[in-house]
């Protein structure tokens, strides 16, 4: 149901610049003070027991297998026997009462421990809920301040979802507007609007399980509330600044965009609560959890972009990676692992991989961190084998749930799992090849890397996905400095550029980087000592190695995330939160117990937090000071013109971000879109983007007609925009098509006069719609 419509003046706003040791010591002291008491009381106990045995057995020892019992009768008692009997009676009575008192005292201690344990868990989860709500409020505040989302019309809200965000949201919109949920699901699994005239399964291609689940929740919740007559949204007439007309704006669960964004922010709020629990477990202290939460907030702009771009795949996927790494930490630390932990690991793997195509490469770096730990001996072979089997099961489940998507079988992740399993099966044979322990390690490492690369290449050829762009291909292009049209389209985008030089400086100002360097240094000292112990003394310190497994894993994973973030700036979303988690180890007794036995570690922690907060609070203030209001009048005019002046089956082509908005808001068929990983789509996009090349107009027109395009949306900015040297469309095309480098740009010609091969049918300050003749 919809509440009453009221008038509300949109407020003016400025534009956004861019639209514990003490307890252990006490236990040791208690044990040390009790031992002498036990030694002093031992002779007395032996005297009493000898007296009791002498009286009952007449000085004889008990026969083998006999039980102690008192004589049934005493025929005669002399004075000595009387006093002996009295002493025995006191002893028996005292022992019984001592046993009873000891039992009651032990029971009382158990109850107190249980109550303290329950209170500790209540406190832990209570704090986790608190920081989760805090993060949720932080996200919605930043999002509202930036977009003024509560005052936008439905069309304006859709336009805020630019590039691939609009593409994902369009499928959510399709399901909720369909007559039934199953009909909507069938529509997106047999979609003809996205890559016209092809019919594609968008759930398989675009990893749309989040949209399917949220759409199901939306239809269910709204259906129940409508059944009981509960109001689901309230609408206003919002007066916009001149020359914009008045629009209707709605808030509440009944508004699809508000519901969709709300679910994403709730999920990421829960993630912050999970961060607190995770880091508390890793560090062994709730203060460690506090350190992680504070570091995350103080470095929020470097840790996530969910507050600016909610519908991106990482917003749904990354919280489940945090859950997966928490469960894996429990498995690595615990000596006896229950089946439920492996089941939870499998679930979190699947939940992490299903929404995001890049997730498999992140899990590959995880196996690459675990394998050397297995080789050196930080992980028991049986435990590591179970972890590999769980990961294999996760790949199989994702392959099934994604309708046989061959990308899951041809990735580095699946290849390294098979190679790891093979090395474990043939370990005895491989051991014969190496003489020393170090040689054995190196041979296994070479087999692992070479086998993974070769198997990945073979499976890609067999599955026919060798031409698809993945995260690994972009990293390889970065390292090898290989450039072509496809890689430049990616790497010229700011989020796929190298890490900014200012990023490490920001980490230093909040003390995050210095803290991580100290912690990493201490862990590496442990690693070197352990390896030297194995290699040079030939003594395998199994207990110590197993105790340090989770610390080694997090350090190796930190190195992997650092490398990824340096090569691709977008992957800071893995590095910065992981640094925040590892910062909690400043409260670890195993790393800093030598320090905390000399000074109170609470003072150290709060001192660090105080110094962090100097720059951290300034960062938060900068985020909160971002005030803006979304508006894009040229695109709004374009969408209105398309809705009212073109047929519903008119096919459009143009820049990928604009095509996503046209598909979302007008439901017109498009031939290209921002999901650029597929090889066929990249070929289509290259044809579409040839308008910005130096090719002839007739050649471009003929290629567009082969794609059944009726209208081309030309953007003047794309003709001249240059984000950095070598990244304008003309420069990219000169690399791809050097034979036409001497010709004039086609875009400039079409802007002057589009005839005879095109006709300009719509024009404003940003867009021109060219009808293809």
From Swiss-Prot:
Residues 1-45 are annotated as: Disordered. Disruption phenotype: Deficient male exhibit sterility associated with globozoospermia. The chain crosses the membrane at residues 123-143, 210-230, 257-277, 312-332, 359-379, 387-407, 438-458, 508-528, 549-569, 591-611. Predominantly expressed in testis. Present in testis but absent from epididymal sperm (at protein level). It is an enzyme of class 2 (transferase). It comes from the Eukaryota. Its main location: nucleus. GO terms for biological process: spermatid development. It is found in: Nucleus inner membrane. One of its GO terms (cellular component) is nuclear inner membrane. InterPro entries: Dpy-19/Dpy-19-like. Belongs to the dpy-19 family. This is Probable C-mannosyltransferase DPY19L2. It comes from Mus musculus (Mouse).
């Amino acid at each position: 149901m919809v509440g009453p419509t009221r008038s509300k003046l949109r407020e003016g706003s400025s534009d956004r610049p861019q639209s514990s040791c003490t307890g252990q010591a006490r236990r040791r002291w208690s044990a040390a003070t009790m031992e002498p008491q036990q030694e002093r009381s031992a002779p007395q106990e032996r005297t009493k027991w000898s007296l009791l045995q002498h009286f009952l057995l007449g000085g004889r020892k008990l026969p083998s297998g006999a039980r102690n019992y008192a004589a049934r009768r005493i025929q005669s008692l002399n004075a000595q026997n009387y006093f002996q009997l009295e002493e025995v009676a006191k002893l028996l009575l005292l022992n019984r009462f001592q046993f009873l008192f000891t039992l009651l005292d032990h029971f009382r201690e158990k109850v107190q421990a249980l109550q303290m344990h329950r209170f500790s868990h209540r406190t832990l989860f209570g704090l986790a809920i608190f920081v989760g709500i805090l993060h949720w409020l932080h996200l919605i505040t930043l999002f509202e301040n930036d977009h003024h989302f509560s005052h936008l019309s439905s069309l304006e809200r859709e336009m805020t979802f630019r590039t691939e965000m609009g593409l994902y949201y369009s499928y959510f919109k399709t399901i909720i507007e369909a007559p039934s949920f199953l009909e909507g699901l069938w529509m997106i699994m047999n979609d003809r609007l996205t890559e016209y005239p092809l019919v594609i399964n968008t759930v398989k291609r675009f990893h749309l399980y989040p949209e399917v689940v949220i759409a199901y929740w939306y239809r269910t919740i709204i259906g129940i509330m409508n059944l009981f007559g509960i109001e689901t949204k309230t609408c206003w007439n919002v007066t916009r600044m001149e020359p914009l007309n008045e629009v209707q704006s709605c808030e509440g669960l009944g508004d699809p965009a508000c519901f969709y964004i709300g679910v994403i922010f709730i999920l990421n709020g829960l993630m912050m609560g999970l961060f607190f629990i995770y880091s508390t477990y890793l560090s062994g202290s709730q203060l460690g959890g506090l350190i992680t939460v504070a570091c995350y907030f103080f470095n929020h702009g470097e840790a996530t972009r969910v507050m600016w771009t909610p519908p991106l795949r990482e917003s749904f996927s990354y919280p489940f990676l945090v859950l997966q790494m928490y469960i894996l930490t429990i498995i690595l630390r615990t000596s006896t692992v229950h089946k439920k932990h492996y089941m939870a690991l499998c679930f979190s793997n699947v939940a992490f991989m299903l929404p995001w195509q890049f997730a498999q490469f992140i899990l590959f770096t995880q196996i690459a961190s675990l394998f050397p730990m297995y080789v050196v001996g930080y992980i028991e072979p049986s435990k590591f084998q179970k972890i590999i089997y769980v990961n294999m099961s996760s790949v199989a489940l994702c392959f099934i749930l994604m309708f046989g998507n061959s990308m899951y079988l041809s990735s580095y992740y699946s290849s390294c799992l098979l190679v790891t399993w093979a090395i474990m099966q043939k370990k005895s044979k491989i051991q014969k090849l190496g003489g020393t322990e170090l040689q054995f390690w190196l041979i296994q490492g070479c087999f692992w890397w070479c086998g993974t690369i070769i198997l990945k290449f073979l499976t890609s050829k067999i599955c026919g996905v060798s031409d698809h762009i993945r995260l690994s291909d972009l990293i390889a292009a970065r390292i090898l400095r290989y450039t072509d049209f496809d890689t430049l389209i990616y790497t010229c985008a700011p989020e796929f550029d190298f890490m900014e030089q200012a990023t490490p400086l920001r980490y230093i100002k909040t003390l995050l980087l210095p803290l991580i360097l100290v912690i990493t240094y201490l862990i590496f000292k442990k690693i070197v000592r352990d390896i030297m112990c194995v290699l040079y003394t030939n003594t395998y310190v199994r207990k110590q190695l197993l105790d340090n497994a989770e610390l080694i894993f997090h350090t190796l994973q930190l190195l992997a995330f650092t490398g990824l973030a340096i090569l691709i700036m977008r992957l800071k979303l893995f590095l910065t939160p992981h640094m925040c988690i590892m910062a909690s180890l400043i409260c670890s007794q195993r790393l800093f117990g030598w320090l905390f036995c000399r000074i109170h570690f609470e003072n150290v922690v709060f001192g660090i937090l105080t110094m962090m907060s100097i720059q951290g609070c300034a960062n938060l203030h900068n985020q909160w000071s971002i005030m803006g209001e979304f508006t894009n009048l040229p695109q709004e005019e374009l969408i209105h013109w398309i809705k009212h002046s073109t047929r519903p089956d008119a096919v459009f082509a143009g820049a990928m971000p604009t095509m996503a908005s046209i598909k979302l808001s007008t439901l017109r068929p498009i031939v290209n879109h921002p999901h650029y990983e597929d090889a066929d789509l990249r070929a289509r996009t290259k044809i579409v983007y040839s308008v910005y090349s130096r090719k002839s107009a007739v050649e471009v027109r003929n290629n567009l007609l082969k794609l059944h395009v009726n209208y081309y949306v030309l953007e003047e900015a794309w003709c001249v925009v240059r984000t950095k040297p070598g990244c304008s469309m003309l420069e990219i095309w000169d690399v791809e098509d050097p034979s036409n480098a001497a010709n004039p740009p086609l875009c400039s010609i079409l802007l002057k006069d589009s005839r005879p091969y095109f006709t300009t049918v719509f024009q404003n300050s940003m867009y021109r719609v060219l009808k293809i003749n």
